[in-house]
């Protein structure tokens, strides 16, 4: 027994020695071989770095701040061929590790704010219409500056949208043209727009020139190549996409249950070979010809017949039987499979048609995914699970379908209906990254009215906006500030402006009164103003222009504003009733004088009317209540050209405010009571208030309507037939039972 133990110990020791010798010998030979190579390299003037050499070394204090991709390129540039260098320089992925923190200079923005500079167009350079629309949207925005020294962001005038070498829109020698720009600075603080990249057969995401440290606003970008918090994914849109405005969504009313004729539809090309063909070639497995109609055609391209298969003739025949628009408007879900590239025109078409998109494009970074929650508006599928799509969408509850459909309409109208909205959304996302302390949150981006109309510079608290009271569980304000616009001198104690001031001050909801003195005469003495129970603040306008009545004055301490012309005739009861109505509709204009617009077929232009009809689309701000945020929006969102027009004409400011509020809310204003005459008829004809009797005044308002509609790109005003009266208004009951009894006698 002892002998066996000794033999076992001896055998184990021998095995250990053998293993030690084997591995030790290998390491020794490897080190000797390595030393011989170093010696041989030294004789031939070559140097092979040790593995430690590939780790970045920082010879000075600033070296650690060099982007990592630049370090890697510097360390390995010696060991790649010239062709590999060219490929690397022209690749989209060179700055793949760029982020705002490493490849963007924030100091330019903190100094002058978020301003965007567009390079002047170079002589002889052709620009496609789509790119012209992008540049026009930037130049027409509040972010634009013509001074590069004031700019925070730079946009090329060179057309970078189509980088498919087979396209007639392809711009040659773009690399040298970009490098010659004196402000290029390796792309730092630059934004490059791109819709198409790569070409047949693999359609890579290479844009064909070195973008350096520039950001990409790119369509069909993959999650693999998307640089989070740096690039912006934009939708693929056609050359016919409107520059401004755009059509509204096609959902006119909600149907319960929210099911349509077809459950799932698709009509498009079937790629017989190459990238993107796998999914579309398999769609026939899901098509049932009843409520799931997925149609493809082989008829596209020059040589489709060379590659046609046994199904092509049957597919082409069935493809012609269905009208695409009819399918789109009568389907609950629309399939959006990838094409040659990840993005597809079908995406925006489905959104507009209120057809819930079913995404089948693995690896696609969805448009504006940084701020939009697409799970609220689309079904994200998987190309590998195509056969499970029908059963998946059938299992979605009707309540969820209705919510998805409504969200498609909101997103379409807020961010995608025009090139301008796509561009402005891109810029707002970048601005939020720069000024994170006042950036918009997810609720703002994904709830009405959307991120473009909610300016965080106004406030970082959602309760200061009129759109989120229900979300926050808040009640609308309980007090208002009356702002009286005075343009005539105070010569008599019986003037309408003094009567109006007293009537407003007696309201139980009035917190203060501000008189905006836009008269050429000096301010009257304090004793000329009547004594009231609330503070009266008189502000003398510096410029004395019409737009000054909508400036966001710090003196306005309440969220509600009662806007009044000096010759308005209102009683305290009318003021109280209008305010209580506004508390139920804090995002709208609520008031008394109603006007309407119409389309004049003979003149092919918009018309303005003050006739008493069965509907209206405007409530004039001479006697109306609205949220004070609209003062800020009027001053900071609208372009200077429209405000200058208003000031030059001394007219149309009330129309412009109605345009703005309707564009934001997508809702009409609200008229209260049947009162039609709200102006004092005994005003002196020599006063500025007599402009209402001027025939040119009405003609100017007609012209304003069309100018405003042109800037918005569509007519935002919406007709309404609703009028709100007090309960028991003119009912045959005792007057003592009525709360607003004085209104019936007015």
Curated annotation (Swiss-Prot):
It is an enzyme of class 2 (transferase). GO terms for cellular component: catalytic complex; endoplasmic reticulum; endoplasmic reticulum membrane; Golgi apparatus; Golgi membrane. Glycans are attached at residues 89, 330. InterPro entries: Exostosin (IPR004263), Exostosin_GT47 (IPR040911), GT64_dom (IPR015338), Nucleotide-diphossugar_trans (IPR029044). Its main location: Golgi. GO terms for biological process: heparan sulfate proteoglycan biosynthetic process; protein glycosylation. Residues 29-746 are lumenal. It comes from the Eukaryota. Pfam families: Exostosin_GT47 (PF03016), Glyco_transf_64 (PF09258). Pathway: Protein modification; protein glycosylation. UDP binds at residues 267, 269, 271, 280, 319, 324, 346, 349. GO terms for molecular function: glucuronosyl-N-acetylglucosaminyl-proteoglycan 4-alpha-N-acetylglucosaminyltransferase activity; metal ion binding; N-acetylglucosaminyl-proteoglycan 4-beta-glucuronosyltransferase activity. It is found in: Golgi apparatus membrane; Golgi apparatus, cis-Golgi network membrane; Endoplasmic reticulum membrane. Belongs to the glycosyltransferase 47 family. Part of the heparan sulfate polymerase, a dimeric complex composed of EXT1 and EXT2. Could also form homooligomeric complexes. Interacts with NDST1. This is Exostosin-1. It comes from Papio anubis. The lineage of its organism: Eukaryota, Metazoa, Chordata, Craniata, Vertebrata. The gene is EXT1.
């Amino acid at each position: 027994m002892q002998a066996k133990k000794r033999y076992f110990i001896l055998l184990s020791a021998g095995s250990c020695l053998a293993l030690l010798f084997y591995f030790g010998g290998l390491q020794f030979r490897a080190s000797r071989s390595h030393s011989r190579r170093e010696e041989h390299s030294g004789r031939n003037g070559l140097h092979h770095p040790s593995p430690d050499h590939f780790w970045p070394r920082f010879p000075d204090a600033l070296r650690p701040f060099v982007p990592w991709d630049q370090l890697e390129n510097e360390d390995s540039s010696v060991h790649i061929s010239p062709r590999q260098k060219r490929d690397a320089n022209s690749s989209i992925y060179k700055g793949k590790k760029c982020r705002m923190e490493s490849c963007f200079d924030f100091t330019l923005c903190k100094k002058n704010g978020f301003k965007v500079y567009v390079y002047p167009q170079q002589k002889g350079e052709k620009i496609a219409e789509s790119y012209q629309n992008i540049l026009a949207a930037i130049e027409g925005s509040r972010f634009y500056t013509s001074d590069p020294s004031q700019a925070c962001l730079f946009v090329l005038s060179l057309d970078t949208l189509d980088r498919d070498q087979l396209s007639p829109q392809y711009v040659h020698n773009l690399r040298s043209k970009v490098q010659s720009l004196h402000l290029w600075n390796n792309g730092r603080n630059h934004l490059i727009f791109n819709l198409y990249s790569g070409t047949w057969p693999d359609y890579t995401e290479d844009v064909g020139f070195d973008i350096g440290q520039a950001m990409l606003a790119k369509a069909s970008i993959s999650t693999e190549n998307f640089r989070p918090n740096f690039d912006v994914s934009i939708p693929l849109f056609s050359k016919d996409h409107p520059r401004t405005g755009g059509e509204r969504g096609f959902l006119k009313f909600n149907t319960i249950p929210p099911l349509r004729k077809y459950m799932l539809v698709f009509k498009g090309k079937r790629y017989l070979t190459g990238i993107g063909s796998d999914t579309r070639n398999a769609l026939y497995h899901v098509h049932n010809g009843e409520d799931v109609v997925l149609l493809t055609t082989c008829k596209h391209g020059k040589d489709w017949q060379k590659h046609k298969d046994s199904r092509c003739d049957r597919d082409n025949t069935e493809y012609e039987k269905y009208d695409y628009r009819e399918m789109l408007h009568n389907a609950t879900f629309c399939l959006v499979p990838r094409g040659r590239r990840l993005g597809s025109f079908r995406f925006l078409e489905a959104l507009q048609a209120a057809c819930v998109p079913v995404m089948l494009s693995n690896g696609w970074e969805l448009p504006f995914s940084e701020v939009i929650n697409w799970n609220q508006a689309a079904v994200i599928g998987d190309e590998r699970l195509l056969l499970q799509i029908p059963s998946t969408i059938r299992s979605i509850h009707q309540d969820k379908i209705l919510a998805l459909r409504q969200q498609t309409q909101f997103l379409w109208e807020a961010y995608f209906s025009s090139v301008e909205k796509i561009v402005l959304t891109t810029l707002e996302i970048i601005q939020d990254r720069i000024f994170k302390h006042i950036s918009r949150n997810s609720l703002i981006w994904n709830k009405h009215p959307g991120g473009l109309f909610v300016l965080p510079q106004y406030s970082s608290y959602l309760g200061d906006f009129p759109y989120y009271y229900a979300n926050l569980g808040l009640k609308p304000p309980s007090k208002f500030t009356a702002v009286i616009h005075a343009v005539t001198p105070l010569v008599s104690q019986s003037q309408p402006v003094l009567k109006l001031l007293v009537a407003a001050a007696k309201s139980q909801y009035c917190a203060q009164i501000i008189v905006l003195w836009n008269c050429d005469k000096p301010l009257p003495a304090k004793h000329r103003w009547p004594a009231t129970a609330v503070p009266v603040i008189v502000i003398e306008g510096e410029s004395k222009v019409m737009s000054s009545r909508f400036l966001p004055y710090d003196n306005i301490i309440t969220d509600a504003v009662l806007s009044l012309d000096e010759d308005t005739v209102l009683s305290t009861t009318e003021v109280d009733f209008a305010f209580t109505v506004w508390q139920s509709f804090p995002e709208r204009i609520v008031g008394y004088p109603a006007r309407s617009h119409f389309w004049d077929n003979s003149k092919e232009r918009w018309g303005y009317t003050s006739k008493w009809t069965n509907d209206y689309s405007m409530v004039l701000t001479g006697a109306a209540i609205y949220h004070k945020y609209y003062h800020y929006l009027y001053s900071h969102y609208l372009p200077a050209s429209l405000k200058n027009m208003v000031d030059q004409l001394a007219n149309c400011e009330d129309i412009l405010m109605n345009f703005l509020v309707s564009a934001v809310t997508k809702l009409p204003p609200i008229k209260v009571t049947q009162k039609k005459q709200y102006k004092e008829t005994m005003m002196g004809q020599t006063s500025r208030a007599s402009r209402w009797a001027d025939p040119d005044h009405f003609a100017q308002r007609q012209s304003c309507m069309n100018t405003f509609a042109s800037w918005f790109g569509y007519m935002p005003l919406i007709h309404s037939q609703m009028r709100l009266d007090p309960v028991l208004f003119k009912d045959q009951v005792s007057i003592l039972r009525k709360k607003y009894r004085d209104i019936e006698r007015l």
